[in-house]
Curated annotation (Swiss-Prot):
Annotated organism of origin: Shewanella halifaxensis (strain HAW-EB4)
The UniProt record lists the keyword S-adenosyl-L-methionine: yes
Entry GO terms, CC: cytoplasm
Binding annotation for S-adenosyl-L-methionine: 35-37, 55, 80, 102, 109
Keyword rRNA processing: yes
NCBIfam families to which the protein is assigned, alphabetical: 16S rRNA (cytosine(1402)-N(4))-methyltransferase RsmH
Protein's job: Specifically methylates the N4 position of cytidine in position 1402 (C1402) of 16S rRNA.
Protein name per Swiss-Prot or TrEMBL: Ribosomal RNA small subunit methyltransferase H
UniProt KW keywords: Cytoplasm, Methyltransferase, rRNA processing, S-adenosyl-L-methionine, Transferase
Catalytic reactions on record: cytidine(1402) in 16S rRNA + S-adenosyl-L-methionine = N(4)-methylcytidine(1402) in 16S rRNA + S-adenosyl-L-homocysteine + H(+)
Record GO terms (molecular function): rRNA (cytosine-N4-)-methyltransferase activity
Gene name per UniProt: rsmH
Length: 315
């Protein structure tokens, strides 16, 4: 029997509003999760609209059964980093009216101890988004070099004590391998001296391992670039980030593609030619959840929504 976990989509109204839904438009939900954003998009689409959802989590694919009778909807089992490939296979490159990306780990993934994402619930050290393939967190921790662990913790978790934690993990695994989330979380809590207020000492390390195991930042980079190639002129991009690494990537991506190509000083190039190379324009300011939403859903606290619009292609 499958245990059900509630999931509240973050910034739901704002994110879908950012897509500026056309009744007959074609949209991508690159991170289906449990279908909250997809449901909202479908509510706003007309009978001739279309929604293509993507997710690499087999449990998310199973959850998509809720829309099996809706002919406007289809689900693709795969990573959002490959969204451009999926769209090209469907013959829809340059015809997508909006792309929605939500980089958060869903509540069902966090709440299901068997998935191994949470340091608050004891379970196997897995952390794979697609638990049918790839190495688990336990397998990586069992053989990673101290230098590699320290680099992952610092780069993907912005963990200040990365080297100390890596050394302690290496020392402890000599006695017994880390197989459970609680074993790793307890070790980090035990060796961390300067604890951050209202934050579990293992937060950054768990985030770092999850990002590394799932190649999340590479997937994000590919998804953003892919969205640029599939969007129709005036198509919208709505992106929700949950930590500073993700948000910096999104912010820089929008800024870079809004400014156009950088030209070496002195080159005879007109403003019109520079404008032609601009591919996006930001829409409004970054949006954060209201106090009311955070009260309803504490996991929304760190979320940030950024919206951009595709400019016409170069002539």
């Amino acid at each position: 029997m499958t245990q059900e976990f509630e999931h509240l989509s973050v910034l739901l109204t704002e994110t879908v509003a950012g897509l500026n839904i056309k009744p007959d438009g074609i949209y991508i939900d690159g991170t289906f999760g449990r279908g909250g954003h997809s449901r909202k998009v479908l509510e706003e689409l007309g009978p001739n609209g279309r929604l293509i959802a993507i997710d690499r989590d087999p449990q998310a694919i199973a959850a998509a059964e809720q829309f099996k009778d809706d002919s406007r909807f289809q689900i693709v089992h795969g990573g959002f980093g490959q969204l451009a490939d999926y769209v090209e296979d469907l013959g829809l490159k340059g015809k997508i009216d909006g792309v929605l990306l939500d980089f958060g780990v869903s509540s069902p993934q966090l709440d299901d101890a068997e998935r191994g994402f949470s340091f608050l619930r004891d379970g196997p050290l897995d952390m794979r988004m697609d638990n049918s393939q790839g190495q688990t967190a336990a397998q990586w921790l069992a053989r990673a070099e101290i230098e590699d662990m320290a680099w992952v913790f610092k780069t993907y978790g912005e963990e200040k004590n990365s080297r100390h934690i890596a050394r302690c993990i290496a020392a402890d695994r000599e006695k017994a391998p880390f197989l459970r989330t609680k074993e790793l979380a307890d070790l980090i809590a035990r060796i961390t001296k300067n604890k951050e207020r209202n934050k579990h000492p293992a937060t950054r390390v768990f985030q770092a391992i999850r990002i590394y195991i799932n190649s999340e930042l590479e997937q994000i980079d590919q998804a953003l670039e892919g969205a640029l190639t599939v969007l129709a002129p005036e198509g919208r991009l709505s992106v929700i980030s949950f930590h500073s690494l993700e948000d910096r990537m999104v912010k820089r991506f929008i800024r870079r593609n809004s400014q156009g190509e950088s030209v070496p000083h002195g080159l005879p190039i007109t403003e019109e030619e520079i404008n032609k190379s601009r591919k996006l324009k930001g829409v409004g300011k970054a949006i954060k959840p209201s106090a009311e939403e955070i009260e309803r859903n504490a996991r929304a606290r760190s979320s940030v929504l950024r919206i951009a619009q595709r400019l016409p292609y170069e002539a």
